[in-house]
Amino acid sequence: HTRGFSASRDELISNDLPSMDAATGEKYVGNSDDSWATRSGFFRVNYSFADRYLLEVNGRYDLSSKFPKDDRSVFSPSFSLGWKLSEESWFKQATNGFFDELKIRASYGSLANQALDNGWYAYLSNYGTGTLGYIMGGKQPQYVLPGGLVSNTVTWEKVTQWDLGLDFVILQNRLKGTFDYYQRKTTDMLGPGRILPNILGMSEPLENAADMVTRGWELALTWNDQLDNGLHYSVGFNLSDTRAEITKYDNPTKSLSSPYYEGQIVGDIWGYESSLFQSADEIASAPDQSKLDGGISKVPGDIRFMDIDGNGVVDYGENTVDKPGDMKIIGNNKARYRYGFNISADWKGFDLGIFFQGVGKRDLMLPYTFKWQYGSMWQVPTAVGNDYWREDNAGGWLPVARFNGSQALGQNQTRYLLDASYLRLKSLSFGYTLPVSLTKQWGIQKCRVYFTGENLLTFKHTPEGFDPELDDPYKYPQQKSLALGLNVVF
């Protein structure tokens, strides 16, 4: 339950008198009073027999005022099973003690989500009120607007997942590993429903509009060892991948204007094959692409779109999956093959830690900031803005400089589809701990000097100014940092 109150007044007489009575302009007063509630119950049961057979059962029941009365409840059960094969005598004999530990796991469960992006009561339509910006009868008239469309059957979004896993330890506890394969089904996804005709004059209501299936796997390996000279070291590696597919959505024509269609791989980028015109002869023999570039009078260096279907016109057809014209899937913006590896070591007081992380595959259409003609001069990194086509730079990345080329440049296309995979030295640390026999003479229990660094190296394919680790290109890139430190314990 939240309550809010606000009051303000224009035309303050003096900044030194921050009082509403010290102003002469209009007064504005507002308040808010919002509330919502949940009611929940849950249970958990754990069972272990001989530290060999493991069982856990969970369940919870939830009610939420965010949904209509008949759709407020949801029950979310889950269970997990584990079997330590390495504790079985017959398995030890069969493997001749090769496995120090081996466990197989299985789990199944569901969760529910009530997070709504458009307010606390998505099934209720609200009126909008305000003051018009013109004068009638000596004063500004008030107005009341009808609310948008709502669904009276909106309810919980549900996620159900099953998982199969394997944990193992071998080679005298030096090599440890885990592997998981999972499938997650999201049903009754909260989002906009089927696209409605523009003549309606309102946007689509929030509905339980779609189902999605996500499949993925995760692998992690760690090696620990100590050499005869006292050097202890550890090396770790992890790798994972996931893909999501829309399995239900009310879009019978599979329109590409809709947010989803059945069979869609989440993150797919539809676009055109493109290059740059290099001569007037290429322009004269090119198919009609006026639907994509606005019919501008083209010159060498302008964007050239490919006529994939060979009909002499470059366009988007009926803008559907089955009739996309010259469009096709040119990439996918979801990160795949996320990986990381770390190294740590210590020897005679010295310690070292290194951590790398990266993404093996990801495609990206950069936003307008990185396309010179589509943004202002203040938005574009110099290295990018200067690399445009001209006679002495026919290999320039951006097209020829012009004031009316934004429509062509704004199309999703292969020329400006970037490889957003990367490898980054995320952190590095190196330190030395002075011998205790020395520090005790100074009344110090421990003394360590160290150096640390973050984001020191990045191997990437994207233009300068864009950080491939960030999902939002407009966020400020992560900064490199260096530090020297001293830890003293008395």
Predicted feature locations:
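Extracellular/periplasmic, surface-exposed regions of secreted and cell-surface proteins
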Residues: 1-271, 408, 412-490
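Acidic side chains
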Residues: 62, 163, 167, 180, ...
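Conserved small-residue
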Residues: 207, 224-333, 373
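Short linear motifs in exposed loops
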Residues: 317-318, 355, 401
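Intrinsic-disorder/low-complexity loop/linker signature
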Residues: 25, 309-312, 395, 406, ...
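Short, flexible active-site loops
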Residues: 324-325, 350, 409-414
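Extracytoplasmic gating/loop element in the C-terminal half of outer-membrane beta-barrel translocons
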Residues: 64, 305, 359-448
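Glycine-rich, aromatic-lined ligand/substrate-binding cores of catalytic
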Residues: 332-365
